[in-house]
């Protein structure tokens, strides 16, 4: 991504954060619940993630969380260790990206988990995330 493209994206994110603000994450309850309601429009989701907030619910209303502590991966600064890189190269599988997004998220949604009923990947969430993926 060029510098001008990066500035453009940064400007768009700042605009979305102003248009769809969330409360200060320090106001979250002990579980990280920060807000409820709203919708899963792409603009709101992008604004939420830019503010360290994500939706996690299984029926209405939409619940928005910002737990502390929270792990954040920043791909440009992510360093893969030598032993992991060696294992990936030697593994009998193939790593691909952006080839079957809907199928992968649907499989995650349908996976059974011990001691857990249902899934947080509701039909609305599936469509919202597929919509974000389609936007790039």
What is the meaning of each model-derived region?
Residues 1-136:
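N-acyltransferase acceptor-side catalytic subdomain
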């Amino acid at each position: 991504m060029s510098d001008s493209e990066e500035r453009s994206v940064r400007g768009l994110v700042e605009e979305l954060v102003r248009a769809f603000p969330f409360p200060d994450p320090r106001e979250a309850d002990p579980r990280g619940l920060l807000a409820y309601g709203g919708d899963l429009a792409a603009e709101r989701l992008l604004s939420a993630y830019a503010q360290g907030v994500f939706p996690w619910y299984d029926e209405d209303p939409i619940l928005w969380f910002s737990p502390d502590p929270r792990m954040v991966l920043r791909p440009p600064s992510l360093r893969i260790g030598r032993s992991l890189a060696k294992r990936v190269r030697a593994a009998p599988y193939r790593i691909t990206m952006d080839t079957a997004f809907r199928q992968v998220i649907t499989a995650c949604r349908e996976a059974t988990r011990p001691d857990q009923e249902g899934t947080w990947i509701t039909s609305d969430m599936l469509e919202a995330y597929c919509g974000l993926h389609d936007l790039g």
